[in-house]
């Protein structure tokens, strides 16, 4: 309907197809979820947000990548070949120093996570997943 794009890209680039669109869609969906639901008295803001979300479908790769990562890190004790492969496939570069591995997302030092070389308890993988999810997704 509009002649100009609704949004323009900034300087950040997609690390994988549709990544930035997913971040924008997620922010819009969160806002939409927080709006009051009034069946008999619709909200213009809710209608606009829903319309934008409907017009901008995406593959939802973030959810797939998070599920793969959560599966791989379940019960983490040490960096196995399966975990290493999953981390690399998701976009992490793995370097080791001392008692930790350093995970750098798409070789961008702004997005690093430290991973113990040996997990201290069964929650280690869950905690690592939560930290990665917070920093990356």
Show the residue positions of the predicted features.
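Long mid-to-C-terminal scaffolding/interaction modules that assemble large complexes
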Residues: 55-137
């Amino acid at each position: 309907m509009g002649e100009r794009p609704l949004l323009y890209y900034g300087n950040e680039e997609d690390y994988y197809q549709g990544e930035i669109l997913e971040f924008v869609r997620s922010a819009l969906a969160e806002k939409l979820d927080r709006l009051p639901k009034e069946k008999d008295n619709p909200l213009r803001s809710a209608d606009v947000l829903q319309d934008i979300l409907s017009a901008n479908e995406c593959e939802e790769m973030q959810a797939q990548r998070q599920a793969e990562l959560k599966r791989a890190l379940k019960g983490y004790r040490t960096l196995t070949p399966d975990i290493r492969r999953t981390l690399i496939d998701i976009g992490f570069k793995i370097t080791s120093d001392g008692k930790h591995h350093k995970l750098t997302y798409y070789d961008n030092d702004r997005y690093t996570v430290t991973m113990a070389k040996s997990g201290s308890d069964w929650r280690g993988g869950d905690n690592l997943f939560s930290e990665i999810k917070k920093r990356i997704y």
